[in-house]
Amino acid sequence: MRNERITYEEQYQGHPIMTDKEKQLGCKEAILQKIDQIMTDMSNRHSKVLFMRYDVRFPKGYGHPNDNELFSQFQETFIKNRKRAGYDPAYIAVRECSREKHQHYHVALMLDGHKTQNIHDHIQTAERLWEKTLNLPPKNDDARRTTSYGLIDDCMRNRQGQPQGNGVMLRRDDPEYKHKYDQCFRRCSYLAKVNQKDSSPKHQREVFSSRIQH
């Protein structure tokens, strides 16, 4: 997605987004459009939707691939797993490759809020499936208990390390529904930000999403 339209406006389709005209921080309109489509579709399908974020990283020292095959394989397996569990998942993900953080993926996931109320099982399942995708050996803590590698960031802290919430229940009958929806849209717009330090290979796919159900 090169040479795409960038917006520096404060809103997209009436929803707040993460932009700053003075600092020339913009968002890619094509990704905002996809976010809008997926969030609208999920809110039409379910009167309660659980919105959550997570990031996917590779372990230190792991050879970072130049393609998206491992992430695509993981995400497909994870979404199939959540579908079989009855959560009717929908997602949008973006690849980011910077010199500081290397290759990683940002994901926004939406689930049927009648079937799930918190993020923890989904994060743990993602951890297990991502480690399996990477063929990582089992890891134990000091007490020899099985533990995870911590490669799925549950986004419970912001970039400054301060605690932040994750897992917002969007209930259509909630008087705060529009405000919460807008806050989720704004948080999701982080996936559309223009990364000035992006070092992704050209012609490499950077956006992944579930299909809109008609």
Annotate each PLM feature:
Residues G63-N68, Q103-Y105, D121, H203:
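Generic alpha-helix signal with a bias toward terminal, lower-confidence helices
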Residues M52, V56, Y105-L111, A126:
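Generic hydrophobic secondary-structure signal
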Residues D36-C97:
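Signature for HUH/AEP ssDNA processing cores
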Residues M1-H46, G113-H214:
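Catalytic "initiation/cleavage/transfer" segments centered on a nucleophilic residue
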Residues G61-G63, E100-K101, T116-Q117:
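Eukaryotic short linear interaction motifs
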Residues I92-H114:
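Histidine-centered divalent-metal-coordination microenvironment in nucleic-acid enzymes
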